[in-house]
Amino acid sequence: LNLFSNMRKIESQMNAAVTNRYNFSKANTQVSIDDRVASVYLHGNLIARVGDNFVQILDGGWQSVTTKSRLNALLRAVTPDGGVFQKDFTWYYNSSKTGTVPFFSGMEAV
């Protein structure tokens, strides 16, 4: 099973840029590399930072379906099992390490 099979093409391209640390820009999504840290932008708003030892996720000021989709695509590539979901208009982060916790912009994904 291909890891990226259920992802949008732009999300698999974004993940390749983050994983291999190269700059990428297509439509509303950009990846910028600075000192081995990949910064991911959606509509010009920072939604993630990925370093060799950390993953920081943000909502960029917009808790949209697209933001959540980009974050979940990225999390599938860079964390063992992290994910963002919404229940009753509230965002949550879930992983085997944290369980379900309220999402906050700037949190570290583990």
Question: Can you say where each PLM-predicted feature lies in the sequence?
Answer:
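Terminal leader/tail segments of proteins
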Residues: 2-110
